[in-house]
Amino acid sequence: MKEGSSISVAVRVRPFTEREKGLLAETPKSKEFLGDGSLAVSNTSSNTFCTNGIRKIVRVLDDNVLIFDPPEENPLAKVQKSLLPAGKRFRDVRYAFDRLFGEEASQEDVYKGTTEPLLDSVLQGYNATVFAYGATGCGKTHTISGRPDDPGIIFLTMRALLDRVEGLKRTMNVDISVSYLEIYNEKIRDLLVQDPLSMEKPKSLNICEDAEQNVSVPGLSYFTPTNLEEVMEIIIRGNSNRTMSPTEANAVSSRSHAVLQIYITQTPKSGEKQEESESQNSHKVRSVFSFIDLAGSERASATKNRGKRLVEGANINRSLLALGNCINSLCEPRRRQHVPYRDSKLTRLLKFSLGGNCRTCMIVCISPSSEHYDETHNTLKYGNRAKNIKTKVSRNVVSVDRHVSEYVRTIYELRQKVSILQKRIAEESKQLALNKEVRKISSREIKMLDARSMLKNSFDGSRDLQKSLIEHVRTLRRIEDEITLTKMWISIAKESDAMSGHNIKSVETRLAKLYDQRSLITAKVNPEEICKTFQNSISHIVSSFKGEGADMYADMLQDDVDLLKSIIENQILDAKHESETFSSTSRKLIQNLFLLFPLLPGNAIDVNESLARAFDQLVGIVPSEPTIQVPNLIEKGKAPLLSMFEIPRSPSRFKARSPSKAARVLKKPLKKRVRFSEVPTTSSVPPVEIKNKDSKPKVEKSLDKHNMNNDRSFLVPSRDARNSLTSLSLHSNVAKNKSSHSSKWPTHTLSPIITTALKQPVRRISLVSQPLQKTGGTENTPNA
């Protein structure tokens, strides 16, 4: 059984009385149970129509729900104005209760639905109370006491109790005693001690509370019934002594509150062969089963009471008002207000039935007649409130047959157990605290592992973004290199006056476009977007650590994020500085390029097509016309000189990044390189004319060996170029020949800037087929 329990509320609707039946708007043709105290079945029916009748204000829907003041279903009610007061509407209020009994319910049905479930609890040692509540003339006394031919729940309960006691006699000694009292005009009377025929005035009793705050009535008589006949005799005798008188509302009206209590004591039987010992204890189980028949509330105007009856009605209403106040206080425990149990003798007796150690069932008796409209409505409201009352129940077990010395020893043993349990609790508390700290650290370590896994996944997931970022950085570096070279070219072109102003402006336009490209690429180089993904992936874990006060773990995670950020920044720095600056080399290349223009022959000049393409890439101008294929100038045993003029896509071309990198494979085989003969730098070299067309001319130029090794910007004619020059005349002096140069040079193979440069005045040089000897002044032709 649960320690906390609510009051069970059941509603019983009594049938119409003979008088009420005659006042109905339409007399039903079915049998009617009369509610005048006898609840007899009426077979009389009339088809008369009453112009000033009453109506039914309660409709039962099922075992739990009823409707108060439902809409009228009688079609004649529309023409009968007396059924509903003027200006009022039907309330049509629904109430739900634990159990609902209609007009056709019998006493057995009410017993099984209300009292029978409490019988098992009483035998287990729990207190129980059943009381009937309602207005006068609603069937409370009939429900509790009944008649000999139709007994109430008291008789039915005692019958079931005696049957169960017979089954317990094998193991338990069960004692049953009964007391019966009434509260009349706030005075307590014993209903079993007085002779109904005696004219003596009954003695008034008082209410007391013992040390355990149990309510008792000193001087109250107790009877022990052994069979059902004795039980019925007690009930009849008590009802005979109870104060009753007829009123306008009820022909058999109870003028007092009646309380019948059944005291049950159970003691276990000891076996005949059971050894007696000092530690052996026997326990008594005590319980009280109370049945309370409350007097009905009544209105003086309805009952037309005068004199003594009026005083009785006032006292009844006073005690019921105190009961209603107690119910209201118990329904709202949050207010912790005082419950006025002492306002009435009735509430003092019901103190533990309402809010104490007791299981309580409240039977609300109501009338279906519209004559009791307000009383029925108030009764339903109080019953609905009583459902919210909570009670605490416990078994009433008392230990007996124990010597005083055993209590001292028991107390010592209990204290020892308490001390041991306290030590155990302290040790377990320390262990729990340690385990909690260990679990907390373990959970933090798990969070750290999860956070680092998230960081790794975030870093791996940003690989594409990192590659794109590095590519943007390299593109930006390439654009900056192109800008630097272009600015160098413009500066040297302006200093040497080798180019026209139109061409310089074209290059400056290209430089402006490079600036725009650099701005666009610079906007895309934003490592903060990647770093932000690292921070966002673990931000919730960092916040969790800070909320728990684990700043060390939060700082460790932040260090991991900073480490990943530094990796991204280092990748950017590596991409920016992965090649050495080549400003001095590129400047020397451009200077030698401009110095090369005056050295080109006027009518037959072999210019490598790659030189023009390299120059175009240098200034960023794409040739507008297709070029012809001209053999590359390749020095024997060395890399092509043309590669020095190409603008690399990345500065890594100037620096070997990895020894495992594959060597560059030339698409064409190396061709034999012809060198110029060494001649003193202070003397000029006379031209030599080769008349033999079959011989292959060789051109050598005497240069300082040191300058030759340091300055690699000279162009050397290839073997195919020499074959194309055999038909040209070689002269020793330099002559100007603008017209022949412009007419014979294939301008469609070069870019506009180079074409313009070649149109400038140039000096011719003579090519010799044999190297000159410094001594003897004779020429020696080398072997082919």
From Swiss-Prot:
Alphabetical keyword list: ATP-binding, Cell cycle, Cell division, Centromere, Chromosome, Chromosome partition, Coiled coil, Cytoplasm, Cytoskeleton, Kinetochore, Microtubule, Mitosis, Motor protein, Nucleotide-binding
Composition bias type Basic and acidic residues, residue spans: 690-709
Classification via InterPro entries: Kinesin-like_fam (IPR027640), Kinesin_motor_CS (IPR019821), Kinesin_motor_dom (IPR001752), Kinesin_motor_dom_sf (IPR036961), P-loop_NTPase (IPR027417)
Subcellular locations according to the entry: Cytoplasm; Cytoplasm, Cytoskeleton; Chromosome, Centromere, Kinetochore; Cytoplasm, Cytoskeleton, Spindle
Keyword Cell division on entry: yes
GO molecular function: ATP binding; ATP hydrolysis activity; microtubule binding; plus-end-directed microtubule motor activity
GO biological process, one term: mitotic sister chromatid segregation
Residues engaged in binding ATP: G134, A135, T136, G137, C138, G139, K140, T141
Disordered as annotated region, ranges: 677-715
One of the record's GO cellular component terms: microtubule cytoskeleton
Pfam families hit by this protein: Kinesin
First-listed, main subcellular location of the protein, grouped into a coarse class: cytoplasm
Coiled coil: 405-440, 463-483
Highest taxon of source: Eukaryota
Disruption phenotype: Simultaneous disruption of dam1 is lethal and leads to the cut phenotype (septation without chromosome segregation).
Role of this protein: Has a role in establishing metaphase during mitosis. Required for chromosome segregation where it generates tension during kinetochore capturing.
Family: Belongs to the TRAFAC class myosin-kinesin ATPase superfamily. Kinesin family. Kinesin II subfamily.
Subunit organization: Heterodimer with klp5.
Full protein name: Kinesin-like protein 6
Lineage: Eukaryota, Fungi, Dikarya, Ascomycota, Taphrinomycotina
Encoding gene, per UniProt annotation: klp6
